Amino acid sequence: MELKAIRENAGLRQEDVAKKLRVRVSAVSNWERGVNGIASKYIRPLARLYGVTETEIRAASGAAQAARAGKDGA
């Protein structure tokens, strides 16, 4: 599942996540689009916030980055 879908399933906006984690909205957007990986210190808080496992967050983040790499390489 994509990070954006996980966030939306949790009923959260990017702004909500940014505020809870004390990061910029652009950081959350970049994570979801695969522009930047999620720093390890945010994996557990994101998982708790979204109500999923850390493994699911890592998998979604990796998939976003792989998709981005595929687009950039095309």
What are these regions (language model features)?
Residues 14-15, 32, 54-56:
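Acidic-residue sensor for enzyme active/binding pockets
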Residues 23-38:
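Recognition helix of helix-turn-helix/homeodomain-like DNA-binding domains
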Residues 37-41, 67-68:
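Short, solvent-exposed alpha-helical "recognition" segments
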Residues 1-20, 45, 71-73:
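Short basic helix-loop element that most often maps to the first helix and adjoining turn
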Residues 30, 48, 56-74:
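Short, charged recognition helix plus adjacent turn
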Residues 22, 41-56:
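DNA major-groove recognition helix of helix-turn-helix/homeodomain DNA-binding modules
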